[in-house]
Design a protein with these regions (language model features):
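N-terminal helix-turn-helix/winged-helix DNA-binding helices
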Residues: 42-74
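Hydrophobic alpha-helical segments within soluble ligand-binding/sensing domains
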Residues: 164-189, 235-236, 286, 302-319
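Short beta-strand elements in bilobed, periplasmic/extracellular small-molecule ligand-binding domains
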Residues: 88-107, 190-192, 213-233
Length: 340
């Protein structure tokens, strides 16, 4: 028979209320007592009655808040697909997902959305955090007040999240540089386009790219680095500027969304396929460009799986009392025309 909270309380010589606090990760219990109760529960293979809890919450759902960056990036649209898939799967267990889409990459907007979700009484939150001290402070304040917060896609030191879901973007940048080095002249000249310096994932990709080039391909030259905020129109403008300004442009490295803008500019400048193109995220447009040879390779990060994992992780923590591992890493997937 499954062990009960009453039995654990008797063996630990504490009240059932104390055991309930420990198993539901609530404050008000001494560390030594908490450790003792957890050890007993583990030895007895205690399994929480999450179905009973879910039946209660089906009448009063647990609300989860998810904050996404603007959806003009197809990667975000795929994230949303994964979130919606998970919401459909877990709604029967008393989960309601509130998804908020940012319209810019400005910290003030993200802070406003965080406050909206707090007002909506969410019990857990998944945030694609901007690299801003006020954002860090607000998120950490929520965590200190017992809200379950996970971050995704951009990992930022100093945020004390429940866990991080996403890719090692520094590794992704190094992978891009290594692949480019293998298919290019040793002194190739590169134009770089990143989304925003407010997103650590793009900074990490850039740093990984630069470090790998410095270590293994020291004669490669980065001509310029500009932001496009994930907008294809800005990617188009920046790429055309690179083509006009740098006659020896040999490659474009795009860490962000906007691949259609890059390819359109190269076609107008009659630089494609001579200029090599490396990008991140496997979208329908990227697949089309890989197949026709205008993109050399792309690095994927399974956004549908990532979006699903956000809801699943918060569900398991809040309903099943399963604490996630500190980092749920999404592997770097190298895609070429031959692997499609």
């Amino acid at each position: 028979m499954p062990v009960t909270i009453k039995e654990i309380a008797a063996l630990a010589n504490v009240s059932r209320g104390t055991v309930d606090k420990v198993l539901n990760n609530r404050p008000g219990v001494k560390d030594t007592t908490r450790e003792k109760v957890l050890k007993i529960a583990k030895q007895l293979n205690y399994q929480p009655n999450f179905i009973g809890k879910a039946l209660v919450h089906s009448r009063d759902p647990i609300k989860l808040g998810i904050i996404l960056t603007p959806d003009y990036n197809p990667f975000v649209q795929d994230l949303l697909t994964g979130i919606n898939n998970a919401q459909e799967e877990f709604s029967a267990f008393g989960i309601e997902v509130i998804t908020k889409m940012m319209t810019s990459l400005e910290p003030a907007e993200q802070l406003s959305i965080i406050n909206e979700l707090v007002e909506a009484n969410v019990s857990g939150m998944a945030v694609f955090p901007l690299d801003d001290p006020q954002v860090f402070s607000r998120i950490n304040h929520l965590i200190e007040n017992q809200m379950a917060v996970i971050t995704f896609n951009s990992r930022i030191e100093g945020i004390h999240d429940l866990c991080f879901v996403g890719q090692n973007h520094y590794k992704g940048g190094r992978t891009a540089a290594g692949l480019l080095g293998k298919i290019s002249d040793p002194d190739i000249e590169i134009g770089v386009i990143i989304s925003s310096h407010n997103l650590s994932c793009h900074q990490d990709r850039l740093h990984g790219f630069q470090d790998k080039l410095a270590e293994n391909y020291p004669n490669v030259k980065i001509l310029d680095i500009q932001e496009n905020q994930d907008r294809k129109e800005d990617a188009f403008r920046i790429t055309l500027e690179y083509c006009n300004k740098y006659p020896n442009l040999g490659a474009i490295y795009l860490t962000s969304g906007g691949i259609t803008g890059v390819i359109s500019a190269l076609e107008i400048a009659e630089k494609n396929p001579r200029v090599k193109v490396i990008c991140h995220d496997i979208t329908p447009d990227t697949i089309r460009f890989l197949k026709n040879g205008t993109v050399d390779f792309a690095l994927g990060q399974s956004p549908i799986l990532q979006g699903y994992q956000l809801v699943k992780t918060l569900f398991e923590y809040l309903i099943k009392n399963i604490r996630p591992q500190e980092i749920i890493e999404i592997p770097v997937a190298i895609t070429t025309d031959e692997s499609l």
